[in-house]
Amino acid sequence: MKDPRDIIKRPIITENTMNLTAQKKYTFEVDVKANKTEVKEAVEKIFGVKVEKVNIMNYKGKFKRVGRYSGYTNRRRKAIVTLTPDSKDIELFEV
């Protein structure tokens, strides 16, 4: 099994994701090869909370050009983690 800190890259903190924290939903950028089970176990191990479900979205890389050079940006994977109602909040997202 992979190290949990390799699976969870960083939290995604935007206005929309901060509104979701009221519903106990937290958003993270995760490794593109990680599946829902690995994300669930990593969040439970790192933050000490109970996860109810995990939703995952994939983003393909955007096409970019710089002068005569062209290529794609890195693809990304975003996970929205829903905690159980009796679980404590993740302090990382506190204002």
UniProtKB/Swiss-Prot annotation:
InterPro entries: Nucleotide-bd_a/b_plait_sf, Ribosomal_uL23-like, Ribosomal_uL23/eL15/eS24_sf, Ribosomal_uL23_CS. Keywords: Ribonucleoprotein, Ribosomal protein, RNA-binding, rRNA-binding. Gene3D superfamilies: 3.30.70.330. It holds the Pfam family Ribosomal_L23. The keyword Ribosomal protein applies. It comes from the Bacteria. One of its GO terms (biological process) is translation. GO terms for molecular function: rRNA binding; structural constituent of ribosome. GO terms for cellular component: ribonucleoprotein complex; ribosome. One of the early assembly proteins it binds 23S rRNA. One of the proteins that surrounds the polypeptide exit tunnel on the outside of the ribosome. Forms the main docking site for trigger factor binding to the ribosome. Part of the 50S ribosomal subunit. Contacts protein L29, and trigger factor when it is bound to the ribosome. Belongs to the universal ribosomal protein uL23 family. NCBIfam families: PRK05738.2-4. HAMAP family: Ribosomal_uL23_B. This is Large ribosomal subunit protein uL23.
